[in-house]
A protein has these predicted regions:
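A general secondary-structure signal for short beta-strands and their flanking turns/coil
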Residues: 74-76, 97-103, 158-164
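Short, solvent-exposed secondary-structure capping/transition elements
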Residues: 89-93, 114-120, 139-144
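Extracellular/virion structural assembly segments
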Residues: 97-99, 109-133
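Acidic-leaning, charged glycine-interspersed low-complexity segments
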Residues: 121-173
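Active-site-adjacent structural patch at catalytic or cofactor/ligand-binding sites
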Residues: 82-113
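Small/polar-rich, solvent-exposed N-terminal microdomains that initiate assembly or binding
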Residues: 2-92
């Protein structure tokens, strides 16, 4: 038997592309960029951030991998990405060998001293924006991204709080 050569990339081969598309969407959102960049209560009332300035958040407040910076003494807000559970796509008891599905995780958290903003709780505002940007949208994998999980996230002895939220991405194997 010979293995059939496939054309195109699998979902796992495209993970890097998916993550960069996700981060570009996040950094393109003035709401997320302001909540990440400005630690003040009036973060959303600040002037819009220039595109090149939003990309300066990469690897300082935004990370394309699951990374928790050593932030115990530093106040700030952070957004990181992770992946989990990539597998053959299954619906009910039927498994589809031609497709893969998995979760893209957003981890975002903020120091307890800067959670409050003039417009609400910082991580709640971020959650609403991430949901708006990704839930039910297309452009990553085939079909729509679908909300999979949402869990509260507390780290560094409860000095930082936020959420872990995941969306299912499905693509060809």
């Amino acid at each position: 038997l010979t293995k059939q050569i496939k054309r195109g990339k699998s979902a796992m081969e495209k993970l890097g592309e998916y993550k960069m598309e996700i981060l570009n969407r996040c950094l393109g959102s003035q709401t997320l960029a302001k909540l990440l960049k400005y630690d003040s209560e009036d973060a959303l009332d600040k002037p819009d951030i220039e595109m090149e300035d939003t990309f300066s958040l990469m690897h300082t407040r935004v990370f394309p991998y699951r990374f928790v910076p050593n932030t115990i003494d530093e106040q700030g807000t952070f957004l990181t990405l992770g992946v989990n559970g990539f597998r053959r796509y299954q619906e009910g008891f039927q498994v589809f060998d031609d497709y893969q599905a998995g979760e893209i995780y957003f981890y975002f958290f903020t120091h307890v001293d800067i959670m409050r903003t003039d417009h609400g709780v910082r991580q709640d505002l971020m959650l609403a924006e991430i949901s708006k940007l990704f839930d039910g949208t297309k452009g990553i994998g085939m079909g729509e991204l679908k909300l999979r999980y949402l869990n509260e996230l507390w780290i560094h002895n409860n000095k930082f709080g936020g959420y872990a939220v995941s969306f299912t991405v499905t693509d060809f194997k």
